[in-house]
């Protein structure tokens, strides 16, 4: 998609719909389980919110004044991944939307003995307490890449 598509509130719905229409049938079959989500960057989240604000319904007015608990497209929640500050200095896509089952994304923290782990312990006599600091390694992975539907800004 072009950069203008990701900032135009009217185009956001088309992007979400394209992701759904072009998704693997196994993704679509899991909608009833309630674990699907659109993982989006903040610019897409904001543009979709502006799209909803532009609708003339009473609910749109109430949500624009009272705030929204969360956004969803056809019952599938949009999750703002809030990666803008981290992606700015990388070669990765700055704006994207990912449709998948939440259970398809794995986050792990290595708490076992590993060269990257560090644990420091000390006693603070002023507060009369033991303190500790630990450093762990974290990683994430996708279980099944065929269970992803992905759009990004070029």
Each language-model region and where it sits:
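Sequence/fold signature of self-assembling virion shell proteins
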Residues: 1-21, 46-154
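Extended amphipathic alpha-helical segments with heptad-repeat/coiled-coil character used for oligomerization
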Residues: 1, 25-41
């Amino acid at each position: 998609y072009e950069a203008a598509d990701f900032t135009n509130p009217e185009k956001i719905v088309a992007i979400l719909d394209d992701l759904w229409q072009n998704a693997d049938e196994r993704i679509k079959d899991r909608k009833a389980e309630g674990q699907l989500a659109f993982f989006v960057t903040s610019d897409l989240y904001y543009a979709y919110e502006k799209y909803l604000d532009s609708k003339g319904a009473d609910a749109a007015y109430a949500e624009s004044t009272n705030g929204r608990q969360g956004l969803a497209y056809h019952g599938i929640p949009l999750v703002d991944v809030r990666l803008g500050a981290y992606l700015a200095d990388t070669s990765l896509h700055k704006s994207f939307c990912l449709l998948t089952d939440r259970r398809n994304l794995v986050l792990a923290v290595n708490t076992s003995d590993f060269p990257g782990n560090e644990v420091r312990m000390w006693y603070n006599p002023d507060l009369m307490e033991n303190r500790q600091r630990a450093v762990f390694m974290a990683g994430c992975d996708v279980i099944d890449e065929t269970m992803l539907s992905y759009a990004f800004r070029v």
